[in-house]
Structures are given as structure tokens and as C-alpha cells.
Design a protein with these regions (language model features):
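Alpha-helix initiation and N-capping motif
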Residues: 21, 41-45, 83, 87, ...
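N-terminal low-complexity, intrinsically disordered segments
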Residues: 31-48, 93-94, 98-101, 146-159
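Non-catalytic, polymerase-adjacent accessory regions of viral genome-replication enzymes
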Residues: 1-65
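Short amphipathic beta-strand starts and helix->beta connectors
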Residues: 59-62, 112-113, 219-223
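Conserved polymerase palm-domain catalytic core
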Residues: 121-231, 235-257
């Protein structure tokens, strides 16, 4: 959707000034009016409290599995209608506050998989990396930490830091995921992570991956390559081959990822 400058300025101003839960609620309701019009029924403080507190709302998500093209299963966690509406408003706020890295092609307004492919047109060599379990690899602690840094800056006071906790909780869901243990083996653990199925997860994943994009774009520049990322699909391309096993390029990429 197209946003006018007034809406963008107002969202940024309200976000920058908010210090209390009531002010955050007012911001969500302003975003709701932008999305649904003046007749949109505003969220109440009790609704906000209910949806950001997992122990109060134990049915925040419904989980089900779908088949991937590979035949493996992908777990979808669909938020209930109330939480989903809040997440849609929150997602609009994220998109206004944060400017995606130029290398990010997925989940970005005005960009598509075609734009991702155009970056690499004409190059002779293409190297792809698929990030495993993309959304669930991002846990609530990382979301909270990212919200405390620019451009969100929810670390400027104790009250704003508490808002970072609320927003991170609205974005994440506790579920069983795989993590590497100290021996390098994958084990099942329960973590609060970005769920596949929440409206906020795509945008937040780009926000979290901003540092990754900066570092990988830097590697690409040093080796004379093109770099882009479409969601969990990382692509490098070039006119020369630097992708051999044990190459300096691959070693550097592995250190980052």
C-alpha cells in the first residue's frame, strides 16, 4: 500500500516519543486506522496485555505442517485473529521505521524475486546458500536486542526497554526448534522464536539480517562479486570462480554465517 508523507512522519514521531504501554497502544491504533480506515475498532489495553502474554493466551497460535517441494515438512504457526491484527499493525510500523538493506530482495515493498535475479544477470558463476529454518533460527532475545538499537532505539530509558520486551513477545512464539550443541550436533530445544506464519516475521527477519547483509556484501565487494538475499536464499555471482571447496571466499562466508 502507498503511504503518504503525513502518515510516515506521524508513525516515526509517535514511535520515537512513546514511553508507556498506553502510548504504544495509541501507535498501534493509529496504524490500524491507516490500514483499515477511520471506522476500524481500536485495540484495548486488555487486548494488548492478553496477546503479548503467552501464559495468559495459551492459544495464541495454531500449528500445522505443509509439505515443501523437497518433500520435507515445514511447520506453520498461524496466530489467532486478535494477535494477527496487532501483528499487521506492528508490521506496518516496522516497515516505516526501518529501511531494508539494498541487498534484501524478499519481503520488501517494490521488490520481487525477479529483482533478485536481475542482480546476477550476465555473470558466469552463481553460488547459492540456503539458510536452515530461517524464521525459527531467530529467537526472542535477538529481536529484543535489535529493537534496542537504531533506528528503533528502545534502550533510551527503562520504560522504552520494557516496550522492547512487549514488542518482541508479540513477534515471537515458543516452539520446538533445532540448535547446534557444543559438539556440533543438532538437538531439539524449546525456544521463543519468529514463527513461520506471523505477519511480522518476514519484515523482522530482514531487520535482524541487516548486519548479515552488510558483512556478506562487504565480502562480495572484496572478492569482486554480486550479492543478494531473498529471504533465506543467499546468492553470490561473478565472472570468475571463487567458489571452490576450501577457497578463501567460502572460509570467510562460513565464519560469518
Amino acid at each position: 500500500m502507498e503511504l503518504d508523507k503525513k502518515h510516515i512522519k506521524s508513525i516515526r514521531t509517535l514511535f520515537g516519543k512513546m514511553k508507556t504501554k498506553d502510548e504504544f497502544l495509541a501507535l498501534l491504533n493509529y496504524a490500524k486506522v491507516i490500514l483499515y480506515g477511520e471506522k476500524a475498532i481500536p485495540f484495548s489495553i486488555s487486548q494488548l496485555n492478553y496477546h503479548y502474554t503467552p501464559k495468559a493466551n495459551r492459544k495464541r497460535y495454531i500449528q500445522f505442517a505443509i509439505k515443501k517441494k523437497s518433500g520435507a515438512e515445514r511447520i506453520i504457526s498461524a496466530p489467532n485473529n486478535g494477535l494477527k491484527e496487532i501483528q499487521k499493525c506492528l508490521n506496518l510500523i516496522f516497515q516505516i521505521i526501518h529501511t531494508p538493506n539494498p541487498a534484501a530482495m524478499g519481503f520488501v515493498n517494490g521488490k520481487s524475486i525477479v529483482d533478485n535475479a536481475k542482480v546476477h544477470v550476465g555473470n558466469h558463476y552463481v553460488y547459492n546458500i540456503d539458510l536452515k529454518d530461517f524464521f525459527p533460527s531467530i529467537d526472542q532475545a535477538r529481536v529484543w536486542g535489535r529493537l534496542r538499537n537504531a533506528p528503533f532505539n528502545l534502550n533510551e530509558s527503562q520504560k522504552r526497554s520494557e516496550l522492547a520486551n512487549i514488542i518482541a513477545s508479540l513477534c515471537c512464539h515458543e516452539m520446538e526448534v533445532e540448535r547446534l550443541d557444543d559438539s556440533g550436533s543438532f538437538v531439539k530445544v524449546v525456544k521463543s522464536v519468529l514463527p513461520q506464519g506471523a505477519p511480522t516475521s518476514p519484515t523482522m527477519s530482514n531487520i535482524i539480517c541487516e548486519r548479515l547483509d552488510i558483512r556478506l556484501a562487504g565480502v562480495a565487494k572484496r572478492f569482486g562479486l554480486k550479492y543478494s538475499r531473498y529471504a533465506d536464499d543467499i546468492t553470490f555471482s561473478s565472472m570468475h570462480n571463487v567458489y571452490q571447496k576450501e577457497s578463501d571466499f567460502l572460509k570467510e562466508v562460513e565464519r560469518i554465517i
